[in-house]
Design a protein with these regions (language model features):
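Transmembrane alpha-helical segments of polytopic membrane transport and secretion proteins
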Residues: 1-37, 261-277
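Transmembrane alpha-helix signature in integral membrane proteins
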Residues: 75-107
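Loop-to-helix entry region at the N-terminal start of transmembrane alpha-helices
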Residues: 81-89, 131, 139-160, 198, ...
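Cytoplasmic-entry segments and transmembrane alpha-helices of multi-pass inner-membrane transporters
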Residues: 103-138, 162-169, 177
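C-terminal transmembrane helix and the adjacent membrane-cytosol boundary/short C-terminal tail
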Residues: 112, 169, 204, 246-277
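Short helix-to-coil transition segments within interhelical loops
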Residues: 128, 168-174, 178-198, 238
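Glycine-rich helix-loop "coupling/hinge" segments at transmembrane-helix boundaries
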Residues: 139-140, 215-252, 275-277
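Transmembrane alpha-helices
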Residues: 150-154, 187-220
Length: 277
C-alpha cells in the first residue's frame, strides 16, 4: 500500500530520481542494520569474554552484571535522579552556549572593530585545555549545579563564538552588496542574507557543542558534583565498583547519542522547511 509521501514523489520526480531515492533509502536501512548487528555482536563477544574467562572480572565488568545493576538502581529511582541531573545540566549548558554565542557573534558582525579586537582573546581561551578553567570556577562559585553548568559552558562557548563569527563574516559580499543596492540596511542584510545563509552551519556547530557541553558537565561533576553520572563515575572508581563505573559510562554514551539524534532531527526539519519556502 502506497503512502501519501510515495504518491507525492511519483508526481514530483522522474523515474531516474525515484530510483535514486529508493537506493538511498536502501543504503540508509543497510547502515542502520549494520550498526545494530555490530552493537549486538560487540555485546555478545564482550559477555563471552567473561564466560570463557578471557577477561579478568577484577579489572572489568560484564554486560550481564551491568544490566542487573541498572535494573536494581532503577527500582529505587536513585539512578534516574543522577541521569536527570546530568541531562538537565547538559541541556542548560548547551542552550546557554548557543544563546550567548549567537548574541556575541552577531554583535561582532555588526561591530567589526569589536570583533577584530576580541578575536585573538577568544582564540587563546579556546586553546586552553578543556578542564583548565574548572578549578578556578569552583574557587569562585563553590560547588553545586551552577558551577557545573558554567564548567559545561566553558568547554564549548569560545569555539562556538569564533566559528559563528567566522561563518557570518564569510558571507558572499556580492549578496550583501545587492541588499545595499536595493536600499537595505545592515540589519536587513543580517536577517535576510547572513543568518539564513549561515543556518546550516549554525546547526552543525550546535550538534558539535551538545557533546562539548556534556564533556564540560562531566568534568564539573568530577570536581564539584554531589549528583550526576560524573559523580557516580568518581564514586565507582574510589570504591572500586567497576559495574557502577562502566554502567555510568554506557549511560553517558546513550545520552550523547540521544541528544545528537534530537539535534539531527531538528536540523532535518529546518532544512525541509527552508527547501519548501
Amino acid at each position: 500500500m502506497k503512502t501519501r509521501k510515495q504518491d507525492e514523489e511519483l508526481l514530483l520526480y522522474s523515474q531516474g530520481q525515484l530510483a535514486f531515492l529508493a537506493s538511498q533509502r536502501q543504503r540508509k536501512k543497510a547502515v542502520i542494520w549494520s550498526r545494530i548487528i555490530l552493537s549486538i555482536g560487540f555485546l555478545v563477544l564482550w559477555q563471552k569474554g567473561f564466560d570463557f574467562e578471557w577477561i579478568d572480572d577484577f579489572y572489568f565488568s560484564s554486560p550481564r552484571a551491568i544490566g542487573i545493576l541498572f535494573l536494581q538502581d532503577l527500582q529505587d529511582m536513585s539512578l534516574l535522579r543522577h541521569i536527570g541531573m546530568t541531562l538537565w545540566e547538559s541541556v542548560v549548558s548547551f542552550l546557554l552556549i548557543v544563546t550567548f554565542s549567537l548574541i556575541l557573534a552577531t554583535l561582532f558582525w555588526f561591530l567589526p572593530g569589536l570583533g577584530h579586537t576580541f578575536e585573538p582573546f577568544l582564540i587563546v581561551l579556546n586553546s586552553l585545555p578543556k578542564s583548565a578553567l574548572a578549578p578556578l570556577i569552583i574557587v569562585w562559585l563553590g560547588t553545586g549545579p551552577k558551577t557545573i553548568i558554567l564548567c559545561g559552558m566553558s568547554v564549548g562557548i569560545f569555539g562556538c563564538i569564533l566559528n559563528l563569527y567566522q561563518v557570518f563574516i564569510q558571507t558572499d559580499p556580492e549578496r550583501l552588496k545587492l541588499i545595499e543596492t536595493l536600499g537595505g540596511n545592515r540589519l536587513q542584510a543580517f536577517t535576510k542574507v547572513v543568518f539564513p545563509g549561515s543556518l546550516p552551519t549554525f546547526l552543525s556547530i550546535a550538534k558539535t557543542n551538545i557533546g562539548l557541553a556534556l564533556v564540560g558537565v562531566i568534568i564539573g561533576e568530577f570536581l564539584a558534583g554531589r549528583q550526576g553520572l560524573g559523580y557516580l563515575i568518581i564514586y565507582g572508581e574510589q570504591v572500586f565498583k567497576l559495574d557502577l563505573l562502566i554502567m555510568s559510562i554506557v549511560i553517558l554514551c546513550a545520552i550523547a547519542m540521544l541528544l545528537y539524534w534530537l539535534l539531527s532531527l531538528l536540523e532535518r526539519q529546518i532544512e525541509h522547511r527552508m527547501l519548501g519556502m
